[in-house]
């Protein structure tokens, strides 16, 4: 008999709106014993069936919904259906944008909570971020092998969020061939190397694809500063947009080395590039003291907010770094500024940029707004899925 989780009276409203999370505070009782990650049924206080979900006893999110259809079984066929639904959309995007690298599964927004899958050529990179996802590992891999027999599958579930679920960090080959040290993918006419084994996340920031295209369109004739450059995809975009010069800054020499290889891979002019290993905050202050000026600054920092208690300090960090960037821009210059922190609301981020401009002594115009690329969809019932936000700001 399936274990049943009974909600407290009046706590079913979010599920009726098809939100996929059940928090521990919404629960009246659990009927039966469930293993971590096991599939359970969710009922309201009157015993009415609401959803089928994965149980996460170590997490504040006590259950994550697999399905709102009572007759749907969570088996290999279920995962195959979800994969096929997701692939239909990615096929269209891949053809439109010339892609052989994209996010295949974006967790809750593709009906597979706690599961991220990126495809790079014929390599599938898997992240299992919840107890339910881990519990279904073998079934999911079987579904992937059924749908993608040509693909190797590599595990990058080496992310700290698994600790909140009581799960160990895992990484390694699941099946097929080991990925090469650097694998090239195509994006809007660019070739970009992906480091599947050692790179950030699954190896590459696919979510910034549209923003890179925007940077390319803004770059013509401009002197560009690419902050938190990682492997230099924004630098490639700027060079393809005929920038005057692009300086890429990161604290890691290894990613800067890959950035240089990306420039060479696209047969672009290395003499127009500079790679600086430094702390961005310190370097911006040094540039300000030296009187350096730029026409386009790309500010794409790592996540500043891991939990709500860090939001206030993150706001200060975003404000400080964007103030410095605005001070380095010539009149008419463009700042492309981003936040990948899901806990940072877009309206608050916009206010931070406005305050940064005020402190910098400049007026700015918001001329364009960005979000994650379309292979990272946001299902209507789950607004938390919108984590990446950005603005193009013109300095007056």
From Swiss-Prot:
Main location: cytoplasm
UniProt entry keywords in alphabetical sequence: Cytoplasm, Methyltransferase, RNA-binding, rRNA processing, S-adenosyl-L-methionine, Transferase
Reaction catalysis annotation: cytidine(1962) in 23S rRNA + S-adenosyl-L-methionine = 5-methylcytidine(1962) in 23S rRNA + S-adenosyl-L-homocysteine + H(+)
EC assignment: 2.1.1.191
Molecular function per GO: RNA binding; rRNA (cytosine) methyltransferase activity
GO cellular component: cytoplasm
Domain (PUA) ranges: 2-81
PROSITE patterns in the record: PUA
A Pfam family: Methyltrans_SAM
InterPro entries: PUA, PUA-like_sf, PUA_sf, RLMI, RlmI-like_PUA, SAM-dep_methyl-trfase, SAM-dependent_MTases_sf
Keyword Signal: no
Role this protein plays: Specifically methylates the cytosine at position 1962 (m5C1962) of 23S rRNA.
Homology family: Belongs to the methyltransferase superfamily. RlmI family.
Protein name (record): Ribosomal RNA large subunit methyltransferase I
Native organism: Yersinia pseudotuberculosis serotype O:1b (strain IP 31758)
UniProt lineage: Bacteria, Pseudomonadati, Pseudomonadota, Gammaproteobacteria, Enterobacterales
